[in-house]
């Protein structure tokens, strides 16, 4: 009985202690259960509770548990629970026990910077030289995290400070890579090998440069680190340039002066990213004026050498062109970062007024002189070609031209004659060079590339938007030769004569040649320059910032769109457009296309009085009375923005304008024929005046017209004093042109100006002038007719369908019998746009570029309608049992389901 009472008291005492401490007071006998009971206490460093539980327990403190098989000592070291750590050590915990990854408690304490735990572990003979499975010791962890204060305590216990991990990396390697200056100094003071290579031959300096660690690189160099490549020949400088680490590169050059020329020569290495190289040279040049002058002078010398190589027919044209233009781009970039100086067009010393800053261009004058000599000699030969009576003499003269040029150019590079034209090779291959035209065509590309370089150098010294007087003079001087070049090879315009797009005064000289090039080539040139410097404009492929989404309302699309576009950044709109209709989930390219499509219809909505329908009933012209809408000019500006945005992002709009309005956009003067779009009868009268002699008709016309101004007829002069100037047979053409401009331009000039202000926000005038009014209509609105055969040819099938399937054959039979309006509805239903791109269905765009019209099979159920995924131009067509059912369901979908989006 007494024993029973005693046992009961023990139980009650245990219960009381447990309840008071809110935990168990005895460890379970099962080790797995026991360790998970102790672990949270160890993590919280509740050493008294742990001590009490271990007091009368047989629990093995070295018991390994969990996936990585760690002991409680690992947990204490990892969490910094120093009291529990000491308790466990006193109870026999093994300080060198390794978990499944080979880590000891000391590794974990070092990794997490647990200084007190490290000290206690060392007191209990923790081995600092143990490596984990990756070969990392405790000092590697300290080096990775820059725990210098702990490293001082630990390094005295280390037998080999250069112990290597599995990749042959020492603690010094990783400290340099991570930029821990004091850690690097501590390791070096402790005898670390400053030039020790890892398995790939990379030294600590190599590691510092690979991550742009300027300060650690400087410490190493000051301590005598050698400049060594790895086993693949990659040097620390290579790494600095590849990463764009200008500061680290500067340190290398300070300690190894020879590397400056190595850096300059890297401008010719196409494997190095140009933007990284520019970044490095930009930093180095900005340190002092000496660096700035030296870099630019050296770049100019390298460019001159490359330019003369390019002028040699024995060199690789593609390689040398790319190299020259790359060097010149870098040169101009660095030059523009220099100190500002008066810029009056003479900065290159064209009139003997050289500034110190312009002296860096001096080496290039040799190349420009050679270019000028070439063009003069070719001009002379072309003149002879016109007067020569035999072709052989022309060929001989061209061969003489090469001989003469070699004599001139040998003065530039007498030490390396291979850089220049090999005249002997010209003479040895008369079958190639006998025709002077062939020789000129061969050298034209090379000279044109040098001309491009010359323009870049001239432009970088001029204020933005101004053309260098020297370059204009150069083009005018060699006008005939340059026109000869582009006539023989029009591709030169698109490849090298980019200056035409930036110099209106020069563009007019070549416009007739440019307009003669294929529309496709001009489109490519247009978009190449329009999108230059812009990232991928397809917002579908990157996360969309909610603040950048254009949230619009279907029931007030015009006004809500105008409001959100006006609040948006133009630069962000150029980068990409994301549209969401209020209350709808769908987003993506299909929604963007629909937005442009519907919005273009709203622009010509009579309620806004912006545009009026022309006489042909299909095109629109700005409304001269649009001022009835107080915000009409703001709305015209918005309309211009929308058309500019659509063209920028290659989206089609569902609107066609009069030819005269397209001319206004292009800056082309209107003609009297354009009047027919708004007043056909009046246009006929103007035509009659031009076609007939009016001398004796007694028309009594003056250079003025009567017009209704707010209900009152007023006489408006067509030019100053026009009311008193009679229209005669001699001046009737001027009269017709002026009256045309009054009706077609002056009457709507404010509207045109507002529209163009918005349009030019996204489309520069210099680019749009590459096209005529018919081509502009194609660019903006696509093909007006839908070619079913072209549609069929450029359709793909999936999910079990192919062209031979009965359902597909029925589908095309139905499409062929649809009205033009129904075909437009079908196209809009599937693609989100009611227009076919220029070039036909083969150029349909999807969310990721070109995406053909696709028909996918869907299992049929009664009354199931076709659906679509507009982002990928896919029609999901059920497997209908007959053509009649297919036609019925398709028409229901088209007439009732053309608008509205849900998530696919």
From Swiss-Prot:
GO terms for cellular component: cytoplasm; endoplasmic reticulum; Golgi cisterna membrane; Golgi membrane; nucleus. Residues 569-904 form the HECT domain. Pfam families: Ank_2, Ank_4, HECT. InterPro entries: Ankyrin_rpt (IPR002110), Ankyrin_rpt-contain_sf (IPR036770), E3_ubiq-protein_ligase (IPR050409), HECT_dom (IPR000569), Hect_E3_ubiquitin_ligase (IPR035983). It catalyses: S-ubiquitinyl-[E2 ubiquitin-conjugating enzyme]-L-cysteine + [acceptor protein]-L-lysine = [E2 ubiquitin-conjugating enzyme]-L-cysteine + N(6)-ubiquitinyl-[acceptor protein]-L-lysine. It is an enzyme of class 2 (transferase). The keyword Transport does not apply. One of its GO terms (biological process) is regulation of cell migration. Pathway: Protein modification; protein ubiquitination. Its EC number is 2.3.2.26. The active site is at 871 (glycyl thioester intermediate). Its main location: Golgi. CDD domains: HECTc. Keywords: ANK repeat, Cell cycle, Cytoplasm, Endoplasmic reticulum, Golgi apparatus, Membrane, Repeat, Transferase, Ubl conjugation pathway. It is found in: Golgi apparatus, Golgi stack membrane; Cytoplasm; Endoplasmic reticulum. E3 ubiquitin-protein ligase involved in Golgi membrane fusion and regulation of small GTPases. Acts as a regulator of Golgi membrane dynamics during the cell cycle: recruited to Golgi membrane by Rab proteins and regulates postmitotic Golgi membrane fusion. Acts by mediating ubiquitination during mitotic Golgi disassembly, ubiquitination serving as a signal for Golgi reassembly later, after cell division. This is E3 ubiquitin-protein ligase HACE1. It comes from Danio rerio (Zebrafish). The gene is hace1.
């Amino acid at each position: 009985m007494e024993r029973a009472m005693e046992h009961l008291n023990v139980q009650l005492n245990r219960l009381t202690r447990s309840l008071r401490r809110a935990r168990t007071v005895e460890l379970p006998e099962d080790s797995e259960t026991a360790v998970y009971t102790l672990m949270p206490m160890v993590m919280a460093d509740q050493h008294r509770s742990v001590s009490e539980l271990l007091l009368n327990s047989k629990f093995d403190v070295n018991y390994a548990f969990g996936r990585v098989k760690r002991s409680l000592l690992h947990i204490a070291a990892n969490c910094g629970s120093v009291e529990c750590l000491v308790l466990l050590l006193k109870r026999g915990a093994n300080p060198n026990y390794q978990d499944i990854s080979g880590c000891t408690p000391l590794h974990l304490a070092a990794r997490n910077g647990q200084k007190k735990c490290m000290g206690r572990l060392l007191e209990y003979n923790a081995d600092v030289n143990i490596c984990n499975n990756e070969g990392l010791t405790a000092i590697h962890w300290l080096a990775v995290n820059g725990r210098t204060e702990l490293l001082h305590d630990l390094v005295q216990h280390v037998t080999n400070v250069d112990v290597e991990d599995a990749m042959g990396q020492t603690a010094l390697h990783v400290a340099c890579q991570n930029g821990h200056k004091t850690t690097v100094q501590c390791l070096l003071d402790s005898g670390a090998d400053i030039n020790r290579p890892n398995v790939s031959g990379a030294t600590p300096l190599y590691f510092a440069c690979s991550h742009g660690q300027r300060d650690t690189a400087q410490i190493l160099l000051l301590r005598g680190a050698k400049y060594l490549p790895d086993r693949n020949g990659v040097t620390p400088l290579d790494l600095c340039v590849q990463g764009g680490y200008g500061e680290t590169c500067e340190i290398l050059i300070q300690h190894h002066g020879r590397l400056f020329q190595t850096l300059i020569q890297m401008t010719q290495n196409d494997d190095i990213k140009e933007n990284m190289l520019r970044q490095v040279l930009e930093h180095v040049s900005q340190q002092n004026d000496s660096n700035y002058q030296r870099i630019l002078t050296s770049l100019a010398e390298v460019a001159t050498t490359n330019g003369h190589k390019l002028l040699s027919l024995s060199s690789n044209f593609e390689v040398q062109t790319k190299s020259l233009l790359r060097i010149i781009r870098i040169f101009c970039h660095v030059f523009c970062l220099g100190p500002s100086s008066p810029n009056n067009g003479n900065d290159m010393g064209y009139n003997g007024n050289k500034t110190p800053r312009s002296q860096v261009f001096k080496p290039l004058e040799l190349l420009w002189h050679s270019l000028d000599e070439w063009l003069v000699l070719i001009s002379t030969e072309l003149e002879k070609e016109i007067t020569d009576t035999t072709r052989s003499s022309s060929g001989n003269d061209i061969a003489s031209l090469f001989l003469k040029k070699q004599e001139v150019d040998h003065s530039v590079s007498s030490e390396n004659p291979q850089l220049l034209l090999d005249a002997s090779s010209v003479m040895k291959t008369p079958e190639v060079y006998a025709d002077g035209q062939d020789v000129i065509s061969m050298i034209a590309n090379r000279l044109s590339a040098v001309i491009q370089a010359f323009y870049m150098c001239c432009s970088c010294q001029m204020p933005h938007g101004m053309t260098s007087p020297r370059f204009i003079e150069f083009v005018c001087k060699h006008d005939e030769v340059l026109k000869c070049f582009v006539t023989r090879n029009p591709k030169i315009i698109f490849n090298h004569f980019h200056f035409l797009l930036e110099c209106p005064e020069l563009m007019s000289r070549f416009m007739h040649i440019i307009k003669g090039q294929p529309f496709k080539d001009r489109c490519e040139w247009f978009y190449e320059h329009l999108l230059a410097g812009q990232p991928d404009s397809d917002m579908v492929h990157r996360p969309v910032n909610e603040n950048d989404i254009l949230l619009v309302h279907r029931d007030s699309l015009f006004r809500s769109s105008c409001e959100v576009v006006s609040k948006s950044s133009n630069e962000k709109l150029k980068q990409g457009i994301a549209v969401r209709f209020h209350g709808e989930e769908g987003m993506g390219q299909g929604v963007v296309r629909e937005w442009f499509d519907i919005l273009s219809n709203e622009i010509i909505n009579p309620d806004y009085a912006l545009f009026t329908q022309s006489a042909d009933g299909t095109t629109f012209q700005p409304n001269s009375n649009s001022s009835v809408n107080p915000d009409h000019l703001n709305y015209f500006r918005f309309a211009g923005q929308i058309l500019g945005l659509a063209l920028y992002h290659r989206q089609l709009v569902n609107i066609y304008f009069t030819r005269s309005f397209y001319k206004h956009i292009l800056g082309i003067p209107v003609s009297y024929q354009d009047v027919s779009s708004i007043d056909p009868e009046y246009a006929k009268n103007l035509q009659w005046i031009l076609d007939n002699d009016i001398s004796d008709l007694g028309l009594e016309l003056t250079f003025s017209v009567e017009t209704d101004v707010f209900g009152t007829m007023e006489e408006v002069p067509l030019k100053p004093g026009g009311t008193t100037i009679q229209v005669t047979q001699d001046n009737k053409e001027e009269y017709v042109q002026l009256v045309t401009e009054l009706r077609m331009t002056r009457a709507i000039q404010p509207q045109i100006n507002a529209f163009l202000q918005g349009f030019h926000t996204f489309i520069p005038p210099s680019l749009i002038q590459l096209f005529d009014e018919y081509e502009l209509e194609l660019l903006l609105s696509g093909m007006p007719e839908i070619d079913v055969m072209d549609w069929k040819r450029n359709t793909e099938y999936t999910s079990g369908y192919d062209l031979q399937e009965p359902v597909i054959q029925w589908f095309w039979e139905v499409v062929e019998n649809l009205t033009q309006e129904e075909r437009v509805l079908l196209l809009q239903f599937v693609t989100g746009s009611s227009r076919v791109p220029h070039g036909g269905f083969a150029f349909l765009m999807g969310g990721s570029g070109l995406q053909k019209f696709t028909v996918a099979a869907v299992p049929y159920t009664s009354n199931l309608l076709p659906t679509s995924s507009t982002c990928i131009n896919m029609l999901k067509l059920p497997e209908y049992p007959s053509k009649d059912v297919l036609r019925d369901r398709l028409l229901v979908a088209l007439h009732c389901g053309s608008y509205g989006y849900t998530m696919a």
